[in-house]
Amino acid sequence: MINLSTPSDKLLEEIETDLGKLTWWLNKVKGPNVRSNKRKELARKYRAQWAQERKRFIGETLEYKSALGNRWFCYDVVQKPAGAADIMVGVDKFIYWETLGSIGAFLPQWWTDAETMTNHPSCLIYTSHFFQRFAERAKIPFRSREMVMAFVSELNFKPYKEDTDKDGNPILVFRMNHTGFAYAVRRKDNPLVIEVRTYLDETNMTPSKLKRYEELAQRIEADGFEDDTAWLGFIHAAQAGEALGY
């Protein structure tokens, strides 16, 4: 079963194994045209409910348990970019949310070496501590569907700034929304594995740190979250107990 303390190579191997079998299972359950059919269904619901707004829509939930003992809950998600009245724009990305003793979200990716043209697995991990702080500072219940909705609404995959912690170790800073930041570190045993460890909003930041990131905040405000936030795909969530409030 997936555990955040698992060595990076074993962690990526297990996620990759589950990813392949989960994709096969979804195709078996929903048919070979699942993406095409779901795009049409989501487009119809989306245009009816949020034709003039920029929001994400979460659809039905499916549960899958892998042979490795991981339980995944799958959500359909769509978002409309600003200025596109009835057009959905997205890329095929998957997020894996797992809880087996702890809660976490996974974004498996592939990194291509430009010199050798070989692919290497990489993974962005949102840890349990991040979600605890995210729920606490957003004043929403931990391990709830409301927290999932809030997390999905504020996802931002692009690390806008590299910084250092108090010990001089490199960290990555993600702008989650207009008032909050997520802080991540690269694993020492594998720099392609990034752990997002905590969340801070501006009320929890010192004046010096807030001033330090004013330029970042202004950049996000100017960008309008256009870069890596518009996407369409399945969100896969794993949980050992109840299915996030269902």
Model-predicted segments: where are they?
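Ribonuclease/tRNase effector modules and their secretory precursors
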Residues: 1-246
